Amino acid sequence: MHRLTAVAVAAVLTACGSGSDVTALKVAGDSLADAGTFGFKFTVQGATLAQTRIWVDHVADAVDVSPLCPRYTATGPNAVAANPAAAHCTSHAVGGARINVAGTAGDSTPLSIQQQLRDLGATAYGDRDVLLVVGGGNDAADLIGAYLGASADGGAAYVALLGELLSPAQVAQAAAGGNAGLAQAGGLYMAALADQLADTLQAQALAKGAKRVVVLNAPDVTRTPRFLALLAAVAQSSGGGATGAAMAEQIATTARAWVSAYNSRLAQRFATESRVAVVDFFGALNQWLASPATYGLTNTTSPACPATGTDARGLPTYSIQTCTEASLTAAAPAGAGAGWWNSYVFSDNFHGTPRTNALMGNLVNDTLRARGWM
């Protein structure tokens, strides 16, 4: 009797300790979630691709599924296609992907997050599959870049981008409103972008059987080193001093409002949808930046990786694929200890370090636990 009881208890404990009931982890998104489409991940590179870990890898560990691998492969510097040898791979995220790819050429390629979701939706979802989705950051960067370029092209690129998601009447009304109207239209564009993603998730995931969907909202891109450098350049070109600082702050406030418009609309679309959890990445990143020591961080503004050049505006550029743990160890700042880069928030000027990715993984895993999805 005691023997049988012990065996039964052991069986129960084993079942409880096995962790998750998740059957598959599927991913769509941009560089933040890319499992290695281009042969590297968008963070500090480990000794191997498998040892280079981003947040989706931490989620895969937590839900006890096989390591993620990229479904697509690079066929050129800016071209991606399905990899016939990777039909079993479930990570469809691609570095550089957008929800709305400017123009039409990329709309049916994996550089479109909507196309990634269509590709994933070609196979029905199981009841215990988890879908992770992240996007909007590159779209926000495109919108900000076009807006800032208005002084050079008279606003042509910005108006053209607005016209991809807004009606001709909305664009005309924005143009008639001058600078204020055009700035306000950016928020309408980002809200429409959220609708694009929500509609595609509805049609290609929820309608295909997905019951556990986690969507990260967009981070405040103005807090990244890329945009801090851009805003500093704006301040300088606007005369510097208080005048330049005020202009830079005005642009940052406008851009932040655009991202918030996207996030608010995304939250609204899924507020009553029990199958979708929207994770507040925007709020979490700002919390990490506001209280870095709480999260084991010290540097919130500078990239850990060295700049490798400059762009046409004279701003620093980075080569994330050559930024390795070995190279950073060899070029450690004075007094820095082993793995010093993990006290930084950013690896290059737009992407997180392994430590930041671990925090992102924790954020998502907490959401999965709260929903009872793991």
Where are these regions (language model features)?
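C-terminal motif of bacterial Sec signal peptides marking the signal peptidase cleavage site
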Residues: 12-15
